[in-house]
């Protein structure tokens, strides 16, 4: 097994645990997914659609979390289509659900490997991959039903 294979196994295992932690089920709406994460983690969350994102560059969303207050907010671009901003928010939900949380540095991107950015460590890269896997699973849960497919026609 290669190192990349080992990373992928760890990422999938963490994503499975994270997804199970929230007890997400098919047919949920995005708001229900957010509430399920709140219940699972015993926190309060807000998803904020930010109007002024001129300084964000390629950033599609970010998470702020205050452990002492058990509350956080996920910020996404208001200009993005709902399906896109929900995916960005789902990525941030993935960070919350992951048992090895990311460091939250803004320069960390799931599309950048530790080989391309020496400041990004393998554990940080894995945390980004876990969040992406969770976001994709949430998207499948939300958008693969006939109800959603028909509403996009």
Where are these regions (language model features)?
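Short amphipathic C-terminal alpha-helix that caps PH/PH-like domains
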Residues: 90-93, 135
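Active-site scaffold of zinc-dependent metalloenzymes
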Residues: 46-86, 93, 99, 104-105
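Peri-catalytic and regulatory segments of divalent metal-dependent proteins
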Residues: 25-44, 56-68
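Metalloprotease/metallohydrolase-associated module, dominated by Zn2+-dependent proteases
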Residues: 2-39, 103-153
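Short, well-structured alpha-helical patches and their helix-loop capping segments
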Residues: 81, 85, 89, 123-130
């Amino acid at each position: 097994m290669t190192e990349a294979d080992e990373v992928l196994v760890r990422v999938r295992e963490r994503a499975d645990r994270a997804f199970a932690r929230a007890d997400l089920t098919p047919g949920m709406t995005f708001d229900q997914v957010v509430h399920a994460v709140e219940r699972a983690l015993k926190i309060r969350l807000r998803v904020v659609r930010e109007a002024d994102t001129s300084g964000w560059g390629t950033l599609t969303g970010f998470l702020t979390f205050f452990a002492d207050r058990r509350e956080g907010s996920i910020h996404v671009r208001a200009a993005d289509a709902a399906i896109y901003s929900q995916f960005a928010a789902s990525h941030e939900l993935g960070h919350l659900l992951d048992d090895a949380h990311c460091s939250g540095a803004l320069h960390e991107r799931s599309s950048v490997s530790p080989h391309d950015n020496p400041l990004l460590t393998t554990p940080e890269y894995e945390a980004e991959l876990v969040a992406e896997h969770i976001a994709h699973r949430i998207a499948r849960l939300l958008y693969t039903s006939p109800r959603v497919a028909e509403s996009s026609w």
